[in-house]
Amino acid sequence: MIGLNHYLIVSGLLFCIGLAGMLKRKNILLLFFSTEIMLNAINIGFVAISKYTHNLDGQMFALFIIAIAASEVAIGLGLVILWFKKYKSLDIDSLNAMKG
């Protein structure tokens, strides 16, 4: 039987993979993907704890995180597309070219 520890280990590993992606990558699109992996890892942890404590709070938090992640993707990808059209690069180092 799969216990709470197994879910939390998978959640922790996914979060570490997402964090490593955030720290290592210089591509804006890959940073978005890494953020999504981290948010999904948090969702797995919330839902697993919610199931084993018979409390729905974790599942409600997971739904809020899914909604926030969807809005992040919609707005973020729109900005990435505009950035690529203007600068022809998705490299983080090109962010220094911003003037404002």
Curated annotation (Swiss-Prot):
Which UniProt keywords are present, listed alphabetically? Cell inner membrane, Cell membrane, Membrane, NAD, Quinone, Translocase, Transmembrane, Transmembrane helix, Transport, Ubiquinone
Q: What is this protein called?
A: NADH-quinone oxidoreductase subunit K
- Keyword Ligase included in the entry's annotation: no
Q: Any stretches that span the bilayer, and where are they?
A: 1-21, 28-48, 64-84
- Which pairs of Cys residues are joined through disulfide bonds in the record? none
Return the EC number. Answer: 7.1.1.-
**Compartment(s) where it occurs, according to its Swiss-Prot or TrEMBL record:** Cell inner membrane
What processes does the entry annotate via GO biological process terms? ATP synthesis coupled electron transport
User: What is the organism field in this record?
Assistant: Helicobacter pylori (strain P12)
Assembly and oligomerization: NDH-1 is composed of 14 different subunits. Subunits NuoA, H, J, K, L, M, N constitute the membrane sector of the complex.
Describe its function. Answer: NDH-1 shuttles electrons from NADH, via FMN and iron-sulfur (Fe-S) centers, to quinones in the respiratory chain. The immediate electron acceptor for the enzyme in this species is believed to be ubiquinone. Couples the redox reaction to proton translocation (for every two electrons transferred, four hydrogen ions are translocated across the cytoplasmic membrane), and thus conserves the redox energy in a proton gradient.
Q: Which family does it belong to?
A: Belongs to the complex I subunit 4L family.
Q: Which GO terms describe its molecular function?
A: NADH:ubiquinone reductase (non-electrogenic) activity; quinone binding
- Membrane topology type: Multi-pass membrane protein
Pfam families, alphabetized:
Oxidored_q2
Q: Which reaction does it catalyse?
A: a quinone + NADH + 5 H(+)(in) = a quinol + NAD(+) + 4 H(+)(out)
The terms describing its cellular component in GO are: NADH dehydrogenase complex; plasma membrane
